[in-house]
């Protein structure tokens, strides 16, 4: 997992509340358990004018010119600005996978659905909760200024606007540690590889009959 320390990126404003996981990545794309291949179908039913199918070449599909991520000014955005209850609906880890593969490093909103919020941290995507008034101010600035960028400083737990105004955000200390060091569940386990190896050796020595079939 790529470490997240500080990131400055173009902001895309998704001015919709209660965006659910089926809108983030529709159900027909959930057959794969790999973490890759979902970015092209992020917000598929909003980005395209037709119905997407797994394995289809998206380069030939008609784009929806009214969807924000298709606007030329937001191409290359890496910070998503959203409204309340982002990521609600069914539990699917594919949602943060799709956002991450598209290129988003952080999502800023007044609130998130709990399962999506937890899944995001496990996959290197930083969900940031700010006060609704602060999110409103960011929407206003983003819509008024083409090329609008924000700096997210995870170490300091701050979001900095181009005019220097900063907003602080809360994050669990353990989740912060994992993001700063690029540690997912597998990475955390591998940190204890030596201790796990010692336990296995001791376990085998104390209870060898359990391992007879493995000799």
UniProtKB/Swiss-Prot annotation:
Task: Identify the HAMAP family for this entry.
Answer: LeuD_type1
The protein's annotated catalytic reaction(s) are: (2R,3S)-3-isopropylmalate = (2S)-2-isopropylmalate
Q: Report quaternary structure and partners.
A: Heterodimer of LeuC and LeuD.
Give the record's GO CC terms.
3-isopropylmalate dehydratase complex
Give the protein family. Belongs to the LeuD family. LeuD type 1 subfamily.
Tell me the Gene Ontology biological-process terms attached to this UniProt entry.
L-leucine biosynthetic process
The organism named in the record is Xanthomonas oryzae pv. oryzae (strain KACC10331 / KXO85)
Gene label: leuD
Q: Which Gene3D superfamilies does the UniProt record give?
A: Aconitase, domain 4
Q: Could you tell me one molecular function GO term of this UniProt entry?
A: 3-isopropylmalate dehydratase activity
Q: Kindly provide the name given to this protein in its UniProt entry.
A: 3-isopropylmalate dehydratase small subunit
